[in-house]
């Protein structure tokens, strides 16, 4: 028998069960089939049962009416008629009629109540008149004018201007003649130099025609390779130590607390915490009692005690 706990003891399945139970027998984990719904009944499950919509598309009423349990049906048309009948009972007699008849209106255009009545001179009726005949024209004592002068020849004081023709492109022809006269005086074509054109000033501002002096020969110094030495000695870790008598404060021999003596590891034993109870998935007592008592055959007639 090896030392220590076995795997079954570490898992905790063989530990002592709780005393609160309903008397069920132990069922091994492998005794029940895994994913039983994948191999039985219908495999393809389409959409579930249809539920009633919340809209008024399939109802006869235009709006929801309240319906309570035990409430009688109420017809709005019947209630409206009953209300009118109750209001008509409040009438004491016939409708009120004034003692005198309807009075004639007395206002603009009405002569009711006046002493003289309507005036004939202010009547709106049209009077009969003779047909209108237009008067004749006056006698002409002077012949008509030939015009105001605009567009009429030989009417104004001065004589009209004689017509003179003018060429439309006279300016173009004059320029052409000047160009031909200029070309006739030229002796030859334009002078063309077969060299690359240069600027008047040199583009290089440092260019000079003078000869440069000879280069100075610098004597090379002999360099002696010496190891590099810093100007100050190396600093120790922990900050600046310059200006102190000691490089680091010495440890005080008077201890603040007594240090415990450490024993070697070989003499001490390794601490092992005690093993507590292992957790595993279990059903509650109430759930287990319901699963055991209620089945597919007696779920309609079973009567469980409730506390």
From Swiss-Prot:
It is found in: Cytoplasm, Cytoskeleton, Microtubule organizing center, Centrosome. Residues 73-102, 218-279 are annotated as: Disordered. It comes from the Eukaryota. InterPro entries: CFAP96. GO terms for cellular component: centrosome; cytoplasmic microtubule. Keywords: Cytoplasm, Cytoskeleton. Belongs to the CFAP96 family. This is Cilia-and flagella-associated protein 96. It comes from Xenopus laevis (African clawed frog). The gene is cfap96.L.
